[in-house]
Curated annotation (Swiss-Prot):
Matching PROSITE patterns: ARM_REPEAT
Positions of glycan attachment: 14
Positions of modified residues (Phosphoserine): 99, 125, 182, 665, 730
GO BP, sorted A to Z: bundle of His cell-Purkinje myocyte adhesion involved in cell communication; canonical Wnt signaling pathway; cell migration; cell-cell adhesion; cellular response to indole-3-methanol; desmosome assembly; detection of mechanical stimulus; endothelial cell-cell adhesion
SMART domains hit by this protein: ARM (SM00185)
Protein name: Junction plakoglobin
Membrane topology listed for this record: Peripheral membrane protein
Annotated region described as Interaction with DSC1, given as residue ranges: 574-661
Pfam families per UniProt: Arm
Length: 745
């Protein structure tokens, strides 16, 4: 019997768009049909592969044929045997309609007899399927050597017909398993696919590998046969069905075959995949983008290749133009991975990535919303100057009302960055109840520093240097935020949170109405306690001659500067001045005048300038020997430091004898005010005490601290984003949860 007659007519493939599951078929084992990549229709493979061809050559297999019989006779006897088994076990079963019962039936109703007969009919059907399965396996096994030989034939017509036959065999489970067990045949299919220029042959061979890739044994056979470079080559095919088969097969390999990712990278698979993002079939794009995510995750070189081939722009376009949830989710996963790459981040933002991601923050898909939030969080430190983020900011403020930890972490972090040195964004968030929402988030966060610390930083930004800053300062008090904020100064809170809280308290103190609530919350003793502890730690390292290390990413000198600066602003209130003086802080402030850190010298001179308004404090300052370091600071390059020093010297000299006052006056005039008479008047009236700190008067360090970010528990290939630095003491950026995606690669 001819080889072609060993198989039945092909079974029509279920349309892929209706039955597509995200495993590309490997879990269900269901074969799929090729979608149109242009969304214009389907190519029915049955039209190409459903015709039968007669081959003039047969092969005899002596090892499995009874002595004295030819292959044809043995096949006939096997067929007859199967027929006899059917007739013996299931009499009357002869074809597709054999399951119908010969009984009278009222149209639209099932008779009692039919219902009683259902179990026996099911048993009969199962037996028939079992017989057919065995037949398929036996026939495919006997045909494999001949088909392998035909695939290697020099005649392209013969090769095409052989590929069609193997394709039909690969659609049935029994024969497909037989094909997977033949490395020679799989290698022949791969070789044929790689070398052919015939479109029908290319379609059939890619279809074969696609069907085999539904099983782990098939994936291994494809991988060992060098199928990955051949499949990557097929990504350049003009035939849409070939593209579909190639990308889904590669997707299954990337998911489940060890070593496939490296093989795809070495075959320049990324360079071929990124241009496919310009196709317009959503389900094809979903598989393509997931391939990109699998390849880019944990591999910096892959991220740069995607960038070089225009990937960020194409991905942002998908987020902007499509509504298919699975595509949006897979695309957001790629952007999430790319958002921790310093080179990709600006490209995504410049392509409109912030706005495109913001569109989906109100989606009904929690997994899509979460990916968009993480990506926005990671991109936000390079998006502080972006326009058109009004709707994103409003949504982020609304997201602060939810209880999900990941949502709160992302929303607070993004708001912290987007309000950094951006007066427009600060005003918008303040006007949309952002202060109230942030305070409530802090109250609900408990001990979760990943939420509390960026929320405090955002409040710090909102309470300074924009038209609504005073409104924000008052809003913190009116929403009962001051007691909760002051409590954050307590140890054992992490130093980054303590540092951010100190900065917020300094800004709140700029509002006179906040002085009494701050004093009632015992903020001054806590600040002094932190100041003493931090200064002692810093001095120990100075005495030992060692460089001061970071504690949780914060240097103790930053805490010294922050506490002193906050006390400087609080000292504007007479009651606060008295409390600060009674805590015996003047010796420490005088000692800080000798600091090698210019910013610490400035804030120390500033707080002494405030305290010197009271005669008792001025005398104490003079008694501590402050005149000498203050005279030195008159020559400081920092104009603010010199002005504060002059004001203190002028105040403590008021009760001195005329000769001393004259000497101080001459020194002040010669060193500081020689060319600026107005500055002398300013020092006399201590004008600087009425002005808030400007940005350039804050510290410029940008330390880091580690924070584990929850993994994305979706699918078996997850990505995790890792550490992020806190912002500066003033308005500072919070770079992304950066380079930890290698941890799960």
């Amino acid at each position: 019997m001819e080889v072609m007659n060993l198989i039945e007519q092909p079974i029509k493939v279920t349309e892929w768009q209706q039955t597509y599951t995200y495993d590309s078929g490997i879990h269900s084992g269901a074969n799929t049909c090729v979608p149109s990549l242009s969304s214009k229709g389907l190519i029915e493979e049955d039209e190409a592969c459903g015709r039968q061809y007669t081959l003039k050559k047969t092969t005899t297999y002596t090892q499995s044929v009874p002595p004295g019989q030819g292959d044809l006779e043995y096949q006939m006897s096997t067929t007859a045997r199967a027929k006899r088994v059917r007739e013996a076990m299931c009499p009357g079963v002869t074809g597709e309609d054999s399951s119908l019962l010969l009984t009278t039936q009222v149209e639209g109703q099932t008779t009692n007899l039919q219902r009683l007969a259902e179990p026996s009919q099911l048993l009969k059907s199962a037996i028939v399927h079992l017989i057919n399965y065995q037949d398929d396996a036996e026939l495919a096994t006997r045909a494999l050597p001949e088909l392998t030989k035909l695939l290697n034939d020099e005649d392209p017509v013969v090769v095409t017909k052989a590929a069609m036959i193997v394709n039909q065999l690969s659609k049935k489970e029994a024969s497909r398993r037989a094909l997977m067990g033949s490395p020679q045949l799989v290698a022949a299919v791969v070789r044929t696919m790689q070398n052919t220029s015939d479109l029908d042959t290319a379609r059939c061979t890619t279809s074969i590998l696609h069907n085999l890739s539904h099983h782990r044994e098939g994936l291994l056979a494809i991988f060992k046969s060098g199928g990955i470079p051949a499949l990557v080559r097929m990504l350049s095919s003009p035939v849409e069905s070939v593209l579909f088969y190639a990308i889904t097969t590669l997707h299954n390999l990337l998911l489940y075959q060890e070593g496939a990712k490296m093989a795809v990278r070495l075959a320049d698979g990324l360079q071929k995949m990124v241009p496919l993002l310009n196709k317009n079939n959503p389900k094809f794009l979903a598989i393509t983008t997931d391939c990109l995510q699998l390849l880019a995750y944990g591999n910096q070189e892959s991220k740069l290749i995607i960038l070089a081939n225009g990937g960020p722009q194409a991905l942002v376009q998908i987020m902007r133009n499509y509504s298919y949830e699975k595509l949006l989710w897979t695309t957001s996963r790629v952007l999430k991975v790319l958002s921790v790459c310093p080179s990709n981040k600006p490209a995504i933002v410049e392509a409109g990535g912030m706005q495109a991601l913001g569109k989906h923050l109100t989606s009904n898909s929690p997994r899509l919303v979460q990916n968009c939030l993480w990506t926005l969080r990671n991109l936000s430190d390079v998006a502080t100057k972006q326009e058109g983020l009004e709707s994103v900011l409003k949504i982020l403020v609304n997201q602060l009302s939810v209880d999900d930890v990941n949502v709160l972490t992302c929303a607070t972090g993004t708001l912290s960055n987007l309000t950094c040195n951006n007066s427009k964004n600060k005003t918008l968030v303040t006007q949309n109840s952002g202060v109230e929402a942030l305070i409530h988030a802090i109250l609900r966060a408990g001990d979760k520093d990943d939420i509390t610390e960026p929320a405090v930083c955002a409040l710090r930004h909102l309470t300074s240097r924009h038209p609504e800053a005073e409104m924000a300062q008052n809003s913190v008090r009116l929403n009962y935020g001051i007691p909760a904020i002051v409590k954050l100064l307590n140890q054992p809170n992490q130093w980054p949170l303590v540092k951010a809280t100190i900065g917020l308290i300094r800004n709140l103190a700029l509002c006179p109405a906040n002085h009494a609530p701050l004093q009632e919350a015992a903020v001054i003793p806590r600040l002094v306690q932190l100041l003493v502890k931090a200064h002692q730690d810093a001095q120990r390292h100075v005495a030992a001659g060692t460089q001061q290390p970071y504690t949780d990413g914060v240097r103790m000198e930053e805490i010294v500067e922050g506490c002193t600066g906050a006390l400087h602003i609080l000292a504007r209130d007479p009651m606060n001045r008295m409390e600060i003086f009674r805590l015996n802080t003047i010796p420490l402030f005088v000692q800080l005048l000798y600091s090698s850190v210019e910013n610490i010298q400035r804030v120390a001179a500033g707080v002494l300038c405030e305290l010197a308004q009271d005669k008792e404090a001025a005398d104490a300052i003079d008694a501590e020997g402050a005149s000498a370091p203050l005279m030195e600071l008159l020559h400081s390059r920092n104009e603010g430091t010199a002005t504060y020093a002059a004001a203190v010297l002028f105040r403590i000299s008021e009760d001195k004898n005329p000769d001393y006052r004259k000497r101080v006056s001459v020194e002040l005039t010669n060193s500081l005010f020689k060319h600026d008479p107005a500055a002398w008047e300013a020092a006399q009236s201590m004008i600087p005490m009425n002005e808030p700190y400007a940005d350039d008067m804050d510290a410029t360090y940008r330390p880091m601290y580690s924070s584990d970010v929850p993994m994305d528990p979706l699918e078996m290939h997850m990505d995790m984003d890792g550490d992020y630095p806190i912002d500066t003491y003033s308005d500072g950026l919070r770079p992304p949860y950066a380079t930890a995606d290698h941890m799960l690669a």
